[in-house]
Amino acid sequence: MKKYQQLAEQLREQIASGIWQPGDRLPSLRDQVALSGMSFMTVSHAYQLLESQGYIIARPQSGYYVAPQAIKMPKAPVIPVTRDEAVDINTYIFDMLQASRDPSVVPFASAFPDPRLFPLQQLNRSLAQVSKTATAMSVIENLPPGNAELRQAIARRYALQGITISPDEIVITAGALEALNLSLQAVTEPGDWVIVENPCFYGALQALERLRLKALSVATDVKEGIDLQALELALQEYPVKACWLMTNSQNPLGFTLTPQKKAQLVALLNQYNVTLIEDDVYSELYFVREKPLPAKAWDRHDGVLHCSSFSKCLVPGFRIGWVAAGKHARKIQRLQLMSTLSTSSPMQLALVDYLSTRRYDAHLRRLRRQLAERKQRAWQALLRYLPAEVKIHHNDSGYFLWLELPEPLDAGELSLAALTHHISIAPGKMFSTGENWSRFFRFNTAWQWGEREEQAVKQLGKLIQERL
C-alpha cells in the first residue's frame, strides 16, 4: 500500500470512529502535512482519493469537509481471542468500539480529546521550519533512544517539578502505549504476574493478553484510588513482577492519588522488589493550582518506569511518547530496535522546535481551561437530564466522568440501546475482566458541546428512566 493510500485509510477510520463528524472541516493540506509528516503531494493525493470515494467533499476557498452522509465502513469480523489464564478482554472491546465507529454516533465513549483543541498551525510552522534544516543524518541521530534535544527538553520539564532525570535515562517512543508495552517487556517474562487497577485502562489488559502475562486486579476506589492493603496482600501471596498504575487523572475513574499515598505506594512496591510502570498520559490535564507530582518523584531505588506522551495534551497524530527508564533504558532501546526501529524523525524535530518557545505552556493553560469548561457543561447537562438515581462521580482533572447506574441496570445493555439512537458510552466491562463494574460507564466530556450533544444526553436520560 502506498503512503497516500495509508493516509487515506487512516482518515477513513477516523471518520468512521466519529473523530471527524459529517460536516466537520478536516485539517488543511498544510496542517495534515504537519500531522502526518508526509509530503504535500502525498497528502493531496490522499484527500483526492477520499473525495473520489465519497468520504469528503472539497469546498472552494474553504477546504475539505466530511461528506454529509459519509460512507459507512463495513463491520470488521470479530476475531476470537484465545483465553489466557488471566485476561480475555479484546473481543468485548473490539465489539464495542467497532459498533460505535459510525460517524453519526455522538462519541461519548471515545478515549480521545477533540482534535480541534490542538495548535495545528503552530505545529505546522515548527515542522516546516525543521524541514528546511533537516539532513540525511537526521534519521540516524533520532534512532533510539531518540533525539537528544527532545530528551533534554523532557528532562527539563521533569526538573520544573524538582525531579532529576538524566536525558540518557529517557527513551523516545511511538506514543505512550509503546512506552508502556516496552516497559512491561523489559521487566517480565510470559507467565509472570502483573498487578493492575480494577477498573483500569483497557490498553493495560490488552497488553497483558498480548504478552501472555497474568493479571491481578486490585480493588480501586473512585475517589481514593488503589487499596494499598489489598495491594500488599496480593504482593504477599503472588510472585508479582510489575505493577501498571495510573496515579494522576486515572482512566476511567478520574482520581489523582494524594502525595502521601504515592509515597506509600512506591515504598510498598520497593519493599517487595516490584517495578512500578506508571502510566501518566493525563498529567498535564489538571484543574488545580499546581501540577500533581508523579509517583516517580518518590522513587529512590530506580524502581519506577515513568511513561507519558504528548498525545493527550498537544497532538495525537505525532505519536510521540517517552519512558523515563532508569537502569532499564538500554534494554528498552534494544526492544524498540527489534520492533518499531525508531520514532518518526520529523515529528521529534518539530517538537524540539515547538518546545523551544513558551507556546507549549500557553497552549496547556488554554487547553486546561477549555477542558474544565466543557466538563462543567457536560456535568450540568447530565444533572439536568439523567434520573436522580444516577450517581455522577466528578473529579478535578482530565475529560472523563464516571457514572453509576442504580441496581439492577446494566451499562452494557444501556450502551447497546444508546447505539440505536446514535449515542456511544463506554461501559464498565471494557475496563475490567470481572463483573464488578457492570452498572458503571465512562463519559467523555472533551468534545465541543452543542445542540447535538445536549439532545444526546437528554435521550440517554430517557433510556435510563425507561429501565428504572
Roles of regions detected by a PLM:
Residues 1-128, 309, 333, 337-344, ...:
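N-terminal basic, amphipathic alpha-helical segments
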Residues 369-379, 390-404:
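Conserved glycine-rich beta-strand-loop-beta hairpin in the small C-terminal domain of fold type I
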Residues 8, 12, 181, 185, ...:
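Amphipathic, non-transmembrane alpha-helical secondary structure
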